[in-house]
């Protein structure tokens, strides 16, 4: 097998990498900085000869597409914490305390960026450091949705990463730099825009080490990943391979400063409440006023509110990692009432989505209040949070969505509690013109 050629040269002019200032690598080809400048001159000459051609051509370039807000947003345009929470309320049901914590943390972060952009640091030489966020809550409680909604409000690049796929450098899996690559891609490869973005790292509890004590064997997908994430969370100049580092080792890296990137980590941390109970010294017994004990999920959420950093260390997170995520928000499990609200209240509510789908076939879809309650009850029994709602509605609507597009005589479809509980047939209302007429 032939060895790699260490004497790289431009595929267009043939000059070696020693003869040019920069050699850019592509899939099996290379181009030098001189050829890039020559190509730009040729394009500029062609565009100059065609009337009104320059503007559309520049707008169509994805890497130069402007965002709807200016890159240096003045402080007066940063949404206030109350405005951020009100926006979250439109999309995320419940979790008021967690949304308040998120709103304050995000506001302070982008207020800090506005101060850096305006160069009004003052004479006190006080440097404002960022505060990354940790969201703790059961699956389907709104952790990812909250982070996505924040990115939508602030109009900044946003990327979601799964911590379970990350491994220490040199082992099979993804490098931590791939997280930054996703953010860079979502920013249309605009480095300056990516450096102001938000990264949400999901399943962060899955990289906890197996025991509180350091192990003599390497934990490449647990403690090793935590160690690799330390500098990125705190702020460093990271070298990001634009095509991914594992399959394309010979490429120029893009440098990204992570100092101003806001990291939001989320995880379920199953069993963490037991660690807190051991520290407190007694099991928390919650009672409501009429003497009935609190539900197990509600009691677990109350225990988690007594969380201290040492509890996370005992769970398997290293102290250095916890120290870089100072803001902690606990999300409560969703009860039946919250699940019912998720179906109908948010701006992008699930039932509104199906009603819009049915209107495209000229059919009005109705859900009886008792049917909504029955869907929420079934989702609560499945113990997967809001994610169970779509699965249940899909099961209920399967036959309806299969038959309706082929029938032009229908005007209205009503989902009843019997259909939810027994999967019976929906109530259909025909168009008046489709009803049979009685002959005299």
From Swiss-Prot:
<dbReference type="Pfam" id="PF10431">
    <property type="entry name" value="ClpB_D2-small"/>
</dbReference>
<feature type="compositionally biased region" description="Low complexity">
    <location>
        <begin position="62"/>
        <end position="74"/>
    </location>
</feature>
<dbReference type="InterPro" id="IPR019489">
    <property type="entry name" value="Clp_ATPase_C"/>
</dbReference>
<dbReference type="InterPro" id="IPR003593">
    <property type="entry name" value="AAA+_ATPase"/>
</dbReference>
<dbReference type="InterPro" id="IPR050052">
    <property type="entry name" value="ATP-dep_Clp_protease_ClpX"/>
</dbReference>
<keyword id="KW-0067">ATP-binding</keyword>
<feature type="region of interest" description="Disordered">
    <location>
        <begin position="53"/>
        <end position="80"/>
    </location>
</feature>
<dbReference type="GO" id="GO:0051603">
    <property type="term" value="P:proteolysis involved in protein catabolic process"/>
</dbReference>
<keyword id="KW-0862">Zinc</keyword>
<dbReference type="InterPro" id="IPR003959">
    <property type="entry name" value="ATPase_AAA_core"/>
</dbReference>
<feature type="binding site">
    <location>
        <begin position="138"/>
        <end position="145"/>
    </location>
    <ligand>
        <name>ATP</name>
    </ligand>
</feature>
<comment type="similarity">
    <text>Belongs to the ClpX chaperone family.</text>
</comment>
<keyword id="KW-0143">Chaperone</keyword>
<dbReference type="InterPro" id="IPR010603">
    <property type="entry name" value="Znf_CppX_C4"/>
</dbReference>
<dbReference type="GO" id="GO:0009376">
    <property type="term" value="C:HslUV protease complex"/>
</dbReference>
<dbReference type="GO" id="GO:0016887">
    <property type="term" value="F:ATP hydrolysis activity"/>
</dbReference>
<dbReference type="Pfam" id="PF06689">
    <property type="entry name" value="zf-C4_ClpX"/>
</dbReference>
<dbReference type="Pfam" id="PF07724">
    <property type="entry name" value="AAA_2"/>
</dbReference>
<dbReference type="InterPro" id="IPR004487">
    <property type="entry name" value="Clp_protease_ATP-bd_su_ClpX"/>
</dbReference>
<dbReference type="GO" id="GO:0046983">
    <property type="term" value="F:protein dimerization activity"/>
</dbReference>
<feature type="binding site">
    <location>
        <position position="32"/>
    </location>
    <ligand>
        <name>Zn(2+)</name>
    </ligand>
</feature>
<comment type="subunit">
    <text>Component of the ClpX-ClpP complex. Forms a hexameric ring that, in the presence of ATP, binds to fourteen ClpP subunits assembled into a disk-like structure with a central cavity, resembling the structure of eukaryotic proteasomes.</text>
</comment>
<dbReference type="GO" id="GO:0005524">
    <property type="term" value="F:ATP binding"/>
</dbReference>
<keyword id="KW-0479">Metal-binding</keyword>
<feature type="binding site">
    <location>
        <position position="35"/>
    </location>
    <ligand>
        <name>Zn(2+)</name>
    </ligand>
</feature>
<feature type="binding site">
    <location>
        <position position="10"/>
    </location>
    <ligand>
        <name>Zn(2+)</name>
    </ligand>
</feature>
<dbReference type="InterPro" id="IPR046425">
    <property type="entry name" value="ClpX_bact"/>
</dbReference>
<dbReference type="GO" id="GO:0051082">
    <property type="term" value="F:unfolded protein binding"/>
</dbReference>
<dbReference type="GO" id="GO:0008270">
    <property type="term" value="F:zinc ion binding"/>
</dbReference>
<comment type="function">
    <text>ATP-dependent specificity component of the Clp protease. It directs the protease to specific substrates. Can perform chaperone functions in the absence of ClpP.</text>
</comment>
<feature type="domain" description="ClpX-type ZB">
    <location>
        <begin position="1"/>
        <end position="51"/>
    </location>
</feature>
<dbReference type="GO" id="GO:0051301">
    <property type="term" value="P:cell division"/>
</dbReference>
<feature type="binding site">
    <location>
        <position position="13"/>
    </location>
    <ligand>
        <name>Zn(2+)</name>
    </ligand>
</feature>
<dbReference type="InterPro" id="IPR027417">
    <property type="entry name" value="P-loop_NTPase"/>
</dbReference>
<dbReference type="InterPro" id="IPR038366">
    <property type="entry name" value="Znf_CppX_C4_sf"/>
</dbReference>
<protein>
    <recommendedName>
        <fullName>ATP-dependent Clp protease ATP-binding subunit ClpX</fullName>
    </recommendedName>
</protein>
<dbReference type="GO" id="GO:0140662">
    <property type="term" value="F:ATP-dependent protein folding chaperone"/>
</dbReference>
<keyword id="KW-0547">Nucleotide-binding</keyword>
């Amino acid at each position: 097998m032939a060895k790699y050629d260490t004497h790289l040269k431009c595929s267009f002019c043939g000059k070696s990498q020693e003869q040019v200032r920069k050699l850019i690598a592509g899939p099996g080809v290379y181009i030098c900085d001189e050829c890039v400048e020559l190509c730009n001159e040729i394009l500029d000459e062609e565009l100059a000869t065609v009337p009104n051609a320059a503007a559309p051509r520049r707008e169509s370039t994805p890497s130069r597409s402007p965002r709807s807000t200016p890159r240096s947003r003045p402080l007066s345009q940063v949404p206030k914490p109350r405005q951020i929470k009100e926006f979250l309320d439109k999309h995320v049901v419940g979790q008021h305390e967690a949304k308040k914590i998120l709103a304050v943390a995000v506001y302070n972060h982008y207020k800090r960026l506005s101060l850096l952009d305006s160069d009004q640091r003052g004479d006190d030489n006080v440097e404002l450091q960022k505060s990354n966020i940790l969201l703790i809550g059961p699956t389907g409680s709104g952790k990812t949705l909250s982070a996505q909604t924040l990115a939508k409000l602030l109009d900044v690049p946003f990327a979601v990463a799964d911590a379970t796929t990350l491994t220490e450098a040199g082992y099979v899996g993804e490098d931590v730099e791939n997280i930054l690559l996703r953010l860079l891609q979502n920013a249309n490869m605009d480095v300056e825009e990516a450096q102001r973005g938000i990264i949400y790292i999901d399943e962060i509890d899955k990289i906890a080490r197996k025991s509180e004590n350091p192990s003599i064997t390497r934990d490449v997908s647990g403690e090793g990943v935590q160690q690799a994430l330390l500098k990125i969370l705190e702020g460093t100049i990271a070298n990001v391979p634009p095509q991914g580092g594992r399959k394309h080792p010979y490429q120029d890296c893009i440098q990204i400063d992570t100092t101003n990137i806001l990291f939001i980590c989320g995880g379920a941390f199953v069993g963490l409440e037991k660690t807190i109970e051991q520290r407190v010294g007694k099991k928390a017994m919650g009672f409501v006023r009429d003497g009935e004990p609190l539900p197990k999920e509600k009691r677990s959420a109350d225990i988690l509110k007594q969380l201290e950093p040492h509890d996370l260390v005992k769970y398997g997170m290293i102290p250095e990692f916890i120290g870089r995520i100072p803001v902690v928000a606990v999300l409560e499990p969703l009860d039946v009432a919250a699940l019912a609200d998720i179906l109908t209240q948010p701006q992008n509510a699930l039932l509104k989505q199906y009603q819009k789908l049915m209107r495209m076939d000229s059919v009005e879809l109705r859900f009886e209040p008792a049917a909504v309650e029955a869907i929420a009850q079934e989702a609560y029994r499945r113990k997967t949070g809001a994610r169970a709602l779509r699965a249940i509605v899909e099961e209920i609507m399967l036959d309806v969505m299969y038959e309706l597009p082929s029938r032009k005589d229908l005007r209205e479809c009503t989902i009843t509690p019997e259909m939810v509980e027994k999967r019976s047939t929906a109530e259909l209302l025909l168009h008046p013109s489709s009803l049979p007429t009685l002959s005299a």
